């Protein structure tokens, strides 16, 4: 009997299209003689197709394991992992807490540094605050604290207006 793998793709984040590409690669790489792949697409507006995964034990009898290929908010941030925990469904990847912590770049850098891992110099910019230039000079890479897949990254060669 084949293992029934639900691959979650799409989602409501700005990384929807990236998720679709990731899921396509995952599904193409799975051995069809061992796995029955069931694609679950979450639209940009949040509608599930073919149907939602129900957050209750035994509410998803046709799924053996879930492979979340979602990116960003509601995908990598612990949200969908929490839903899968409530649904009592095994899934691939990190759990709720690990997913949540790793989505926050500032927190993750602090955790890594506290554990003795090398971390490049950085500074946190908060909207509405006026800051001086970084002590480590230019160029710098600017990245949103809670997005993944390189979304929103820019390389600044000259000091931008700090906002």
Where are these regions (language model features)?
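Anionic group-transfer/hydrolysis microenvironments
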Residues: 70-73, 123, 145, 157
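A structure-centric signal for secondary-structure junctions around beta-strands
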Residues: 2, 119, 136-137, 150
């Amino acid at each position: 009997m084949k293992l029934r793998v639900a691959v979650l793709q799409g989602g409501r984040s700005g990384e929807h299209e990236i998720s679709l590409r990731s899921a396509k690669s995952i599904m193409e790489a799975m051995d069809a003689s061992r796995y029955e792949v069931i694609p679950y697409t979450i639209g940009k507006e949040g509608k599930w197709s073919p149907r939602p995964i129900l957050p209750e034990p035994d509410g998803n009898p046709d799924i053996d394991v879930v492979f979340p290929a979602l990116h960003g908010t509601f995908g990598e941030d612990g949200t969908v992992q929490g839903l899968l925990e409530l649904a009592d469904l095994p899934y691939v990847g990190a759990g709720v807490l690990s997913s949540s912590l790793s989505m926050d770049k500032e927190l993750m850098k602090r955790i890594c540094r506290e554990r003795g891992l090398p971390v490049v110099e950085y500074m946190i910019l908060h909207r509405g605050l006026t800051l001086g230039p970084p002590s480590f000079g230019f160029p710098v890479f600017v990245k949103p604290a809670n997005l993944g897949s390189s979304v929103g990254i820019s390389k600044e060669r000259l000091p931008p207006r700090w906002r």
